[in-house]
Every structure is written in C-alpha cells, then in structure tokens.
C-alpha cells in the first residue's frame, strides 16, 4: 500500500508540475506577444526623415569594439501656434529654440550634453528648403533660422559645417509632445533657485521646489524673461539641462520602471513627439 500511495503522490506531482509548466509557457507567450506589439507600436509612432540630401559630410570616426559612441543632435521644435503656443502669444514659423549635442558613450552608460545658443550668429550653408521649393542661399544668420528654412537637415548641415564633427543621428522633439511626456510621468520635481515672474510667458513661481505638470514644465523651460541672472538664452539653456536631468531621473526611478503602465505611457508620448533620421528610428539603436 505504501508503494501505491507513493506512486499516486508522484503522479499528482507530475500533473501539477506539467500544469505549472504549461501555464508558465502560456504566460510567457502572452508576455512576449504584448512586448512585441508594444515595441512595434512605439517604433511606428516615430516620424522619419532621410539624410540623403545632406551631401558631403565629415568622416565618421572609426573605433574598435562591437559598438561605437554616438553623436546625437537633439532639437526642440517650437512653432508656438495652436496647442504649442498656449499662453505665450504670437507665433513663429517653426524654429528650433533648443538645440543640444548629446555624446553617448560606446557602452551607453554615460551621456554628455552641450547646448547651442539659439541667438548665436553663424555662417549657415546653402540648404534644401523645408518646403522643397529649392535651395535656400546661406549666409550670416542666427543659429535657429537653420531649422526655420530647412528643418532638421539644415540644422545638421550647419552644425557639421561649423564644427567638422559628424552627427550620427538627429532627434526632433515637438514641444507639445514634451508636455505629454511630463504628464505621463505624473509630473516632475524641479528646484527653482530664484523667483520667476514672466508676464510674456504668463508664469510666476517663487523660489523653491515644485512638482510641475506638463504645461508648467513647458512654460518653465521656455522662460527667458522675468528671472534673475543669468538671463536670456544662456540662462534658459541651463534650466533646460537641469530639467532634462530631473526628467531622466524620474524615468529611471523605481516608481516608473516598476510601473509598466506609466512607463509605456511615457514611451508612447515620447515616441509620438519624435522625428528622427531613418536609421535612428530603430529603437534597437539605443540599446
């Protein structure tokens, strides 16, 4: 009888183990399917632009190893009309008021950013027009006009002609999308070191620490008036860099990474706001 009981127990164990393996396999298949669908959706959100029109470019630096460091030119597109211009008045023809070169290390563990002043006077090369109406003659002009006349390709071409540094990829972030990204995270905590009282941008903040929503964040990173030194575009660049660092910290926090719904909502908002070169639209490039 003992042997029979033992065989029955072993039989039940095998059935339980088999059911657990089958259930685990089903869950794994479902999770894999969800991940593939989510990946495809995020990748499909991104708009792309071909870089063929750039013509002659600086030579890419060759490095040993499976991965190379990347230079990514990040532009913030600000038309300031419609939903993008809420609360600021006026409109612009689509300037890039924010431009930053990000250098990603080969192992992708570090990133270094350098902001480019939008009001800097530069010699812009001849560029294909954004409206595809023919080439736009170059000349001495403000940095952010390159985006207005020729979009991201003219901005890349201008940067490369000035620095002889090859831009491996570019990313354009729409400011409306920026607002959605912050809201998807449930807000971002920032430190305001001195009072902000900007009648043009309609933003007033005493000095202190705040958790800002998307619209408040957008107003804050746009501010160029009504704030103590450093003022103007240089001060704004520093605030933008500090805010981006705070947003990245929120994305990488346990509260976001351990919350699949919040993480996907952020990634969905982020990818919907992006325009990149065709190669960079493959999300695996960031891995």
Residue spans for each PLM region:
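Non-catalytic, solvent-exposed segments at the cell envelope interface
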Residues: 2-287
């Amino acid at each position: 009888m003992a042997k029979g009981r033992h065989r029955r127990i072993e039989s039940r164990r095998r059935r339980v183990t088999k059911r657990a393996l089958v259930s685990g396999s089903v869950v794994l298949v479902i999770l894999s399917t969800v991940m593939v669908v989510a990946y495809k959706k995020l990748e499909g959100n991104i708009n792309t632009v071909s870089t063929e029109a750039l013509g002659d470019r600086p030579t890419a630096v060759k490095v040993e190893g499976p991965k190379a460091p990347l230079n990514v030119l990040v532009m913030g597109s600000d038309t300031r009309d419609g939903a993008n211009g809420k609360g600021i008045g006026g409109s612009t023809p689509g300037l890039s008021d924010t431009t930053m070169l990000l250098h990603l290390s080969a192992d992708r563990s570090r990133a270094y950013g350098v902001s480019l002043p939008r009001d800097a006077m530069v010699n812009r090369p001849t560029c294909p027009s954004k409206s595809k109406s023919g080439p736009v003659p170059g000349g001495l002009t403000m940095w952010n006009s390159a985006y207005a006349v020729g979009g991201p390709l003219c901005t890349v071409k201008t940067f490369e002609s000035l620095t002889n540094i090859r831009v491996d990829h570019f990313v354009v972030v729409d400011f409306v999308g920026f607002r959605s990204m912050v809201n998807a995270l449930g807000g971002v905590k920032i430190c305001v070191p001195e009072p902000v009282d900007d009648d043009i941008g309609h933003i007033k903040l005493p000095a202190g620490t705040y958790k800002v929503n998307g619209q408040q964040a957008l107003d804050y990173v746009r501010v160029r008036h009504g704030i103590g030194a450093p003022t103007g575009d240089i001060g704004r660049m520093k605030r933008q860099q500090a805010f981006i660092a705070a947003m990245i910290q929120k994305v990488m926090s346990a509260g976001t990474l351990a919350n699949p719904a919040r993480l996907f909502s952020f990634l969905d908002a982020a990818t919907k706001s992006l325009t990149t070169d065709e190669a960079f639209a493959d999300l695996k490039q960031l891995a």
